[in-house]
Amino acid sequence: MKINKAEFVTSAVAPDHYPVHELPEVALAGRSNVGKSSFINKICQRKALARTSSKPGKTQTLNFFNINDEIMFVDVPGYGYAKVSKTEREKWGVMMEQYLTSQEALRGVVLLVDIRHDPTGDDVTMYNFLKHYEIPVIVVATKLDKIKKSQRQKHEAAVKRKLQFDPSDRFVAFSAETAEGKDEAWKAIYALITEGE
């Protein structure tokens, strides 16, 4: 997939701040420090489109990115970061729920989990939330380069088991370091935005 345009559009915390456009939207969700920004940067072939940070909880707004005038990526705040106040976490929760359940342009969610570990309770809650609201989901298991090739199947099976993964959903193992899984991720995203057209 050739990326000719990848640009930050705006940040928003409420529907009246969402950008006006006619592109299909794909949200990116995951716990803090799972590698959402690295995923966006790698598949968009940009070094700093989305800001990466060693500090979890950096994304605190809905961040909209126009990709090739074809798709709008929406980076949502990472969940599960303990050092953010309870009030702040609740605020993010309301903002995300409002966006995910009411945005007509939303075609689906890329849910990022760390392939090295079992999904957290928050990961399971998010996956169940998406299934409950019948929001199409792609599970992207990041940090693939951090495990041995011989261990991949075992880790993938563990992630799917913990999530009670629906086989009708798409699963992509991905590495932001090596770009492995990049083409598969794009195929899954394109399938998401073209279904039901």
UniProtKB/Swiss-Prot annotation:
Keyword GTP-binding assigned: yes
Gene Ontology terms: biological process: division septum assembly
Pfam families reported in the protein's UniProt record: MMR_HSR1 (PF01926)
Protein family according to the UniProt entry: Belongs to the TRAFAC class TrmE-Era-EngA-EngB-Septin-like GTPase superfamily. EngB GTPase family.
Cofactor(s) listed in the protein's UniProt record: Mg(2+)
Alphabetized UniProt keyword annotations: Cell cycle, Cell division, GTP-binding, Magnesium, Metal-binding, Nucleotide-binding, Septation
Binding residue positions for Mg(2+): S37, T59
NCBIfam families per UniProt: GTPase_YsxC, small_GTP
Function: Necessary for normal cell division and for the maintenance of normal septation.
Protein name from the UniProt record: Probable GTP-binding protein EngB
